[in-house]
Regions:
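C-terminal motif of bacterial Sec signal peptides marking the signal peptidase cleavage site
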Residues: 27-30
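N-terminal secretory signal peptides that target proteins for export/translocation
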Residues: 1-10
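Short, charged N-terminal beta->alpha structural module
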Residues: 56-82
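A short, gly/pro- and small-residue-rich
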Residues: 116-140, 189-196
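Structural recognition of alpha->loop->beta junctions
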Residues: 156-187
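Bacterial signal peptide processing site
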Residues: 32-34
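Ser/Thr/Gly-rich flexible loops in soluble cytosolic domains mediating phosphotransfer, phosphorylation
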Residues: 126-160, 204-213
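A short, well-structured beta->alpha microelement
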Residues: 79-101
Length: 217
């Protein structure tokens, strides 16, 4: 009699443990599916993805910005004006209608509310320009490269709106390490199966552009 009761008790305990394990598995799975616990794989993002070497060679290239920040101006002074020899179009306010088919567009993302105000552009206007660009990427076979080079200073609720849109729809994401302090930039890339490349300072974009143009030093 005692042996039978003990056996039944053990069965009940085993069943409870099994139910708890199943509950934990279901709970953790649902968290990952809903994006509540985004995970970034153990990967060295400071390594340039080799498959993108030569991506922009012999292509029409555009450099533009989303959010009206001055980060793209810094890039132009430090990199474009000194090291880039191929032809390109630099237009901070370019629209999708002005971008040729089968081209490459570098999009520097980061919001400056002050700059938006000075240019007479509202956040809604800039979001509309962003959406129009994204919606036509496939139609016009445009390759978009997302860049965030303003570091932590170009992060925040307003900037993040633009970052999420660009970094979720580009072909390659490039960013400075300080802007990824919370792993948002790598997480957006991983969740959308987009390769990304992490640099320390914007001056490293000199070599990055060379690699994209198929030039190795």
């Amino acid at each position: 009699m005692n042996i039978r009761k003990t056996s039944n008790l053990n069965k009940c305990l085993n069943l409870i443990v099994l139910i708890l394990l199943l509950f934990n598995i279901i709970f953790l799975t649902s968290c990952n599916e809903n994006g509540n616990t985004p995970l970034t794989p153990d990967y060295d993002y400071s390594l340039f993805p080799e498959e993108y070497e030569g991506l922009i060679k012999n292509k029409q290239v555009y450099f533009t910005s989303i959010g009206q920040s001055t980060d793209i101006d810094t890039f132009k002074i430090l990199v474009l004006d000194n090291f880039v020899s191929f032809n390109y179009i630099f237009d901070k306010d370019i629209t999708i209608n002005e971008i040729q088919e089968n081209s490459i567009v570098f999009v520097f993302v980061g919001c400056s509310v002050k700059a938006l105000g000075e240019s007479g552009t509202s956040i809604e206007d800039e979001l509309n320009r962003t959406n129009n660009l994204i919606n036509q990427l496939k139609t016009k076979n445009i390759t978009m490269i997302g860049l965030h080079t303003g570091g932590q200073a170009r992060r925040g609720s307003t900037s993040n709106q633009f970052i999420e849109k660009i970094f979720s729809n580009s072909s390659l994401n490039i960013f400075v390490e300080s802007g990824n302090f919370d792993n948002m930039l790598t997480t957006l890339s991983v969740e959308n199966n987009i390769k990304c490349y992490q640099i320390i300072t914007v001056t490293e974009l000199n070599n990055t552009i060379k690699l994209l143009n198929g030039v190795k030093e």
